[in-house]
Amino acid sequence: MNIGRMAALLKMMLLKLFREPAYIFLMLLFPAMLTIMFGFIFGDPEFGMSMNVTAPGLFAYACIFIIMTVAQSFADMRDQGLLKRLNTTPMKSSDFMGSEIISNMILVILQVIIVYVLALPFGFTPDTNIFGILLAFLLMIVFSLSSVGLGLITATISKSSGIATGISFIFILPQMFFGTFMPVTSTTKPIASLMPSYHATQALSAIFSGDLTNPQVITGFTFTAIASIIIIILGIFLFKKFGNK
């Protein structure tokens, strides 16, 4: 792995992302609009909910949505022949994958900052210290690895970026409805417990409540980290073996 090559690739990928209006909307403006919409709905005490309950799910959803953009990006690069051209250069696959992972981590940090700042005026009052805030950011960065891995798996089984967009929702929707936005019941909990998003959301809720010693923080962080590492390794393996053709 070469740091110089990774830095050059990282710069290229970030410039490519921010030159595309669709990517800017999906990655930055959409989380902002969703936060504002949820703020107006759930920030009103008449609805019996608060942004303190909703915000952890918004943070997780921002990371989940990366699945689609990663799948689109890799499918586009494959369709344009960019990946094959990279194979003829001194660039190693580890440099390419490393820069892709880092670029998405940067986007996750931006998304989390946007959601955090916009949620504050709507009554989001995290009862934690600076360590808790940093821990929440770290948790979202770790969680983003699973989304990158699922994006790679989606790109592997998709013949085009358009198909990748549709298939990505196979991974997005279950994580949205099982423990991120929708309350978990005794019926849905066995399914939700398999979702990294559920454990990440539960850990975030405990962190923002100020209870850093809550077992949900440790178990949520541990499950999310292990699941994310397994998924990203599987995604890289499948894409290198079957998707880069």
Predicted regions and their residues:
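Hydrophobic alpha-helical transmembrane segments of multi-pass membrane transport proteins
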Residues: 33, 50-121
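Short hydrophobic, aromatic-rich alpha-helical segments embedded in or entering the lipid bilayer
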Residues: 3-9, 181-221
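Short alpha-helical transmembrane interface motifs in multi-pass membrane proteins
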Residues: 19, 23, 52, 63-68, ...
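Hydrophobic alpha-helical transmembrane segments of multi-pass membrane transport/permease proteins
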Residues: 16-44, 51-71, 108-111, 168-177, ...
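Alpha-helical transmembrane segments of multi-pass membrane transporters/translocases
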Residues: 37-39, 202-245
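Aromatic- and glycine-rich beta-strand/loop motifs that create alpha-glucan
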Residues: 1-30, 80-81, 245
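Alpha-helical transmembrane segments and their short interhelical loops
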Residues: 93, 97, 101-166, 173, ...
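Transmembrane helix segments
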Residues: 37-45, 155-198
